């Protein structure tokens, strides 16, 4: 399971011209589910992301977590994170989880974040989405489990 996380001032996702999810200060998560991933990995990533101290304190030192600042999380499924670009010019998605498994684990991740009391918005699984964000920093991390 892979996640690209970005600290944002705001972020939103639009499907078919309609805003389906938006947040203010918080973290945008692009989540890719691969074959062999399970609930334990999704739960670990959820806890890791909301606990990472990537927000500035009074001294502007990265010392506060999403929970500490009362921020929100926008979760967007992105199977292309499972893409392998090592050979040729077209990515291979052989390592991506099948859609039904990807949806199940994406939903598990979202529920794990919500269970921790974090306000969470989402995109729509398998939809063609337009994601907008105002990156804060920029601060971006890649997490893999």
Swiss-Prot record:
Which residue numbers does the motif Gly-cisPro motif, important for rejection of L-amino acids cover?
137-138
Q: Report keywords, A-Z.
A: Cytoplasm, Hydrolase, RNA-binding, tRNA-binding
Which residues fall in a coiled-coil region?
Answer: none
Q: Which GO terms describe its biological process?
A: D-amino acid catabolic process
One GO cellular component term: cytoplasm
**Assigned EC number:** 3.1.1.96
Gene3D superfamilies cross-referenced by the UniProt entry: D-tyrosyl-tRNA(Tyr) deacylase (3.50.80.10)
Q: List the subcellular locations.
A: Cytoplasm
Q: Which GO terms describe its molecular function?
A: D-tyrosyl-tRNA(Tyr) deacylase activity; Gly-tRNA(Ala) deacylase activity; Ser(Gly)-tRNA(Ala) hydrolase activity; tRNA binding
Q: Where are the transmembrane segments?
A: none
Q: Which reaction does it catalyse?
A: glycyl-tRNA(Ala) + H2O = tRNA(Ala) + glycine + H(+); a D-aminoacyl-tRNA + H2O = a tRNA + a D-alpha-amino acid + H(+)
Free-text function comment from the UniProt entry: An aminoacyl-tRNA editing enzyme that deacylates mischarged D-aminoacyl-tRNAs. Also deacylates mischarged glycyl-tRNA(Ala), protecting cells against glycine mischarging by AlaRS. Acts via tRNA-based rather than protein-based catalysis; rejects L-amino acids rather than detecting D-amino acids in the active site. By recycling D-aminoacyl-tRNA to D-amino acids and free tRNA molecules, this enzyme counteracts the toxicity associated with the formation of D-aminoacyl-tRNA entities in vivo and helps enforce protein L-homochirality.
Domain commentary = A Gly-cisPro motif from one monomer fits into the active site of the other monomer to allow specific chiral rejection of L-amino acids.
Oligomeric state and partners? Answer: Homodimer.
The text of the family note is:
Belongs to the DTD family.
Q: What is this protein called?
A: D-aminoacyl-tRNA deacylase
Which gene codes for it?
dtd
